[in-house]
């Protein structure tokens, strides 16, 4: 299964670097493949001062964690996504959160669901009739073996 990782998944990992989300992303023998638009890295960089302030991490520590969290993510350049998908994505999310268009555009291009904890995005897309998102609970059923 391939999923698109949303920025808020990475943000959450900074606040809980040993939590479930970080564990899923860092899993070495993962049955999941992660992809994301390169915009994710730009967004993290933009919010880095806020992350540093709230987590008390140093910039060096945060960069090391970011490397850990993104080591299993394949990044796609927005420039490589056809303009028609960019424009459609912008129309879809303009009333939800315009900053999320790169993730929706990648979904439109690749067809994989977006892994997000952003209820506003997930619910907003559902209200518009789009089934584009996957929950952490759904992700966990694909990555972790059942306990007997």
Identify the meaning behind each predicted range.
Residues 108-113, 117-148:
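Acidic, PIN/NYN-like endoribonuclease modules and their adjacent C-terminal/linker elements
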